[in-house]
Amino acid sequence: MKTEKPKKLIRWCILGAVGCGFMAVGDWLLGCIPLRETDTGLFNRAYYLSGSYGLWKPVLTVGLGAVGGFLYYFVVKALNADIDTKYRKTKIIQYLCGIFTVAVALTIHTWVATMAWFTTYLGPRIGEEAAIAAVTAYQDGMLLAIAPMYVPMILAFGIHFVMLLAGKTRYSRWMLAFHPVTWNLLLAAVPDIAQAMQMPVATWMSVMSQSSTNSAIMVWCIAAAVYERSHTQ
């Protein structure tokens, strides 16, 4: 089942990988900091609270996210084109969820970046406890709107995963090894496993966990582009 020209799909995958790269770099800017055993969550981190973190980094993260979010559209097009045209309703649902995911990705990216900015700015000025209380209130307030946004994102990638598993896409089932769902679970789980094994807290844990989703999608885009190229020669 091949409904799209391979060259077009390769182009979409490459543009999507670049977009994920921009988003992942933003994640790395937020997560690449010295960690302490007492650090928890996305913003309760000693390095932020001390004011040592550069305030320009969250700003750059949002800028990179805007470019990455735009290029995410090509990820959506590529994923949707993979699904067999016989499943028209499934393709429509997956596509609409994918389009919404583009907006969700930038929204969440900005939300996390602003928490880092507020924590860094407020920590040295009003004290660590007051800063944590203020940013926690901001996080909890925004979470009411943010949490439901994960549903279409999960559906966009979950539907594609199920269709690939069922053999209803243009790819062989072994491509599940490179699927965003597979790699997202892997990248998110490794730091937790390392901590369960009582390994010292390290920067790589934060970076891997924080960038897991964007890195996972980038892995898929690269793998899909390579697959298409190898099957058109």
Describe each region flagged by the PLM.
Residues 2-233:
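Hydrophobic, aromatic-enriched alpha-helical segments typical of multi-pass transmembrane helices
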